[in-house]
Amino acid sequence: GMNTFMVPLLGAWILVGLGDMDGALEALKPLNVNKGFKAMFDLHTALINEMAGHSAIAIEAYEKTIEKPGSLSLRLVELLGSLYERTGRADEAKALYRRYMSEHPTSPLMGPALARLEEGSAPRHPVTTAGEGAAEAMFGVSNSVRQRTTQDAALIFGRMALTLKPNFPLAQILVADILEADNRLEKANDLYGSIDLGSPF
């Protein structure tokens, strides 16, 4: 069941909160045994290594998650692109953003990232606390559960992500979208309205 991935994910971020980065990476390892959880393992391995200051290892782990065609999610692009930018690899960031645009030609969301690159201003680190890391885990689970099972479970995990990280536009959109599909329009609109005006969303 869900414990197969929830226990390693949340256990890892609890250990990050306690300052035990090596223990956190070890806690993720059960995810690497199951092919279905490999992308989740690589993503959170990258996030934890990035927080620990191991940028090169983090980039390697992120890059594993985008090897397959069609694997380029918006969140992955944000996370890896941001790290490329903050480590002086602007050309790789630009190539990644352009790849996303070629795969999603109607999306306007890479415009601000490309403009920021031109200005040379580095983005803020997207995950700076264990709580924000756990929010990434909840968001990922919500997204995954929504595609495979019920909206209710997706809504619960999405709400948990927002409890841990209230200003999380992709999670706000996901939860609002679920509410809208359930015809809870007022709550959906409130959530859409709460998205930071400075966000490209």
For each of these PLM feature ranges, what is it?
Residues 153-163, 192:
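Amphipathic alpha-helices of TPR/Sel1-like and other helical repeat/solenoid scaffolds
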Residues 2-10, 34-44, 69-78, 90-92, ...:
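Generic helix N-cap/helix-start motif at coil->alpha-helix transitions
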Residues 107-122:
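Short, structured interface segments
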